[in-house]
């Protein structure tokens, strides 16, 4: 199924569905049977981001990378982001990424310009444990 090509009219429909004339964050491009369609950008309008969303998948399917991309994109658009990062997976957005051959090949194939950059980050620590600005949380009924 992954290597089957979508008919041209479906590709056109997807391209048109994600073409917004308003501020949006760019998630990537359409993968049509293993081939990136660089002019079919997958985007979410900023006004839609305040709604509920779900990122689900098996281990290794890109959930954390998707969250990083969303947080970085929102931050770049001037939208403050609060992310509860229990595992510490998102803390890397505080530093510029390290370019590599695989990343360069992927972004070039997707028609994306990639530059390493750091994002503004403040770290908080629940209950004063760990590094970061201590926060206290009280749960009551």
Predicted features along the sequence, with ranges:
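Basic- and hydrophobic-enriched, low-structure N-terminal and domain-boundary segments
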Residues: 1-58, 65-77, 81-82, 87-109, ...
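Short, conserved active-site loop motifs that form the nucleotide-linked donor/cofactor pocket
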Residues: 121
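ATP-hydrolysis module of ASCE/P-loop NTPase motor domains
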Residues: 126-141
């Amino acid at each position: 199924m992954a290597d089957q090509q979508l008919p041209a009219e479906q590709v056109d429909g997807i391209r048109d569905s994600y073409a917004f004339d308003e501020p949006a964050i760019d998630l990537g491009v359409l993968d049509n049977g293993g081939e990136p369609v660089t002019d079919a950008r997958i985007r979410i309008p900023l006004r839609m981001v305040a709604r509920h969303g779900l990122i689900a998948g098996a281990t290794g399917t890109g959930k954390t990378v998707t969250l990083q991309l969303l947080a970085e994109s929102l931050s770049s658009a001037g939208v403050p982001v609060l992310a509860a990062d229990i595992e510490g997976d998102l803390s890397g957005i505080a530093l510029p990424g390290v370019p590599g051959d695989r990343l360069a090949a992927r972004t070039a194939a997707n028609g994306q310009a990639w530059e390493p950059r750091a994002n503004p980050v403040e770290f908080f620590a629940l209950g004063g444990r760990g590094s970061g600005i201590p926060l206290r949380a009280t749960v009551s009924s």
